[in-house]
From Swiss-Prot:
Catalytic activity, reaction form: L-histidinol phosphate + 2-oxoglutarate = 3-(imidazol-4-yl)-2-oxopropyl phosphate + L-glutamate
Keyword Amino-acid biosynthesis part of the UniProt annotation: yes
Alphabetical keyword list: Amino-acid biosynthesis, Aminotransferase, Histidine biosynthesis, Pyridoxal phosphate, Transferase
Gene Ontology biological process terms in this record: L-histidine biosynthetic process
Species of provenance: Salmonella arizonae (strain ATCC BAA-731 / CDC346-86 / RSK2980)
Keyword Transmembrane tagged: no
Required co-factors: pyridoxal 5'-phosphate
InterPro entries referenced in this protein's UniProt entry, alphabetically: Aminotrans_II_pyridoxalP_BS, Aminotransferase_I/II_large, HisP_aminotrans, PyrdxlP-dep_Trfase, PyrdxlP-dep_Trfase_major, PyrdxlP-dep_Trfase_small
Protein's recorded name: Histidinol-phosphate aminotransferase
EC number: 2.6.1.9
Gene: hisC
């Protein structure tokens, strides 16, 4: 047998994967800090006790207790809920279910969350971008002009990394523009910090609306990797065709069900109250730093701030063990750093470090 024209492992891989730049998660970027304010996590751990002892059995595909608890919490029917390995899997499922590689596209509006782009590129689906306007609101005309061939439109509200809500009237206009043309995915990962802004009540009006949620932020369970997709039953049934047979392990489902109990939800709301209080303390302290240009309003558990010399500020705090998220490479975010709201002690360390920075 001939061994001519043999291919390397890299040659055997798909071309788009060879060229792919992976999403740079906070943990992937590393660092040796002791104050981690770069991943929008809750700053302290929540304790749970496992109640299920059936690890010899495969778990349910869609654990009933988790689905029912989340449906009650979100104000929707259980048939309108899908649980997955974080909201990131929900992004991937939407693209896999609705986009033909090499034919269809997704559309998103930077600056925004990076996994929309990475998921599409991994699957081989084209990406279209319509940058937001100067106030980080939707460019509706630009979206309309680029809708042809776009099957899924991703909108993050509150937006990561800018922290602001998308104008609800603009969201309604977007849903009307896309009716019969594309699915609209509203990423509500941070909605617990502004629950009045959820679009869950709109599902009955818009069959093409899909909402992503997570337990990673206000529920303080980033390490659990548990997210939710809210949509009309027809959409959920399509997603069930492409999701893995066992997306949640038994321990994950056990803890998620506890977190979504009345007691767990009350605890989450108390955490939100504390974070909002600490967010204001952090903002007040930042405004006294000479190196600060502007701190932007936020509806989330993080703030975005522009500095006169953000690269040196980022490195200086990094060297002091304070790890922030550099947003310089995002469109329209030159000079910006994103800071997760931490504990009072962590926030004060940030404030003190920034006050010591030169102009």
């Amino acid at each position: 047998m001939s061994t001519e024209n043999t291919l390397s492992v890299a040659d055997l891989a798909r071309e788009n994967v060879r060229n792919l730049i992976p999403y740079q998660s906070a943990r992937r970027l590393g660092g040796n800090g002791d104050v981690w304010l770069n991943a929008n996590e809750f700053p302290t751990a929540v304790e749970f006790q496992l109640t299920q002892q059936t690890l010899n059995r495969y778990p349910e595909c869609q654990p009933k207790a988790v689905i029912e608890n989340y449906a009650q919490y979100a104000g929707v029917k259980p048939e309108q809920v899908l649980v997955s390995r974080g909201a990131d899997e929900g992004i991937e499922l939407m693209i896999r279910a609705f986009c033909e590689p090499g034919k269809d596209a997704i559309l998103y509006c930077p600056p925004t969350y990076g996994m929309y782009s990475v998921s599409a590129e991994t699957i081989g689906v084209a990406r279209r971008t319509v940058p937001t306007l100067e106030n980080w609101q939707l460019d509706l005309q630009g979206i309309y002009d680029n809708l042809d061939g776009a099957k899924v439109v991703f909108v993050c509200s509150p937006n990561n990394p800018t922290g602001q809500l998308i104008n609800p009237q603009d969201l309604r206009t977007l849903l009307e523009l896309t009716r019969g043309k594309a699915m609209v995915v509203a990423d509500e990962a941070y909605i617990e910090f502004c629950p009045q802004a959820t679009l869950a009540g709109w599902l009955v009006e818009y069959p093409h609306l899909v909402i992503l949620r997570t337990l990673s932020k206000a529920f303080a369970l980033a390490g659990l990797r548990c997210g939710f997709t809210l949509a009309n039953e027809e959409v959920i049934n399509l997603l069930l065709k492409v999701i893995a047979p066992y997306p949640l392990s038994t321990p994950v489902a056990d803890i998620a069900a506890q977190a979504l109990s009345p007691r767990g939800i009350n605890a989450m709301r108390e955490r939100v109250r504390l974070i909002v209080q600490e967010r204001q303390h952090l903002v007040n302290g930042l405004q006294q730093a000479a190196c600060l240009e502007h701190v932007f309003d936020s509806e989330t558990n993080y703030i975005l701030a522009r500095f006169t010399a953000s690269s040196s500020v980022f490195k200086s705090l990094w060297d002091q063990g304070i790890i922030l998220r550099d947003q310089n490479k995002q469109p329209s975010l030159s000079g910006c750093l994103r800071i997760t709201v931490g504990t009072r002690q962590e926030n004060q360390r940030v404030i003190d470090a920034l006050r010591a920075e030169p102009v």
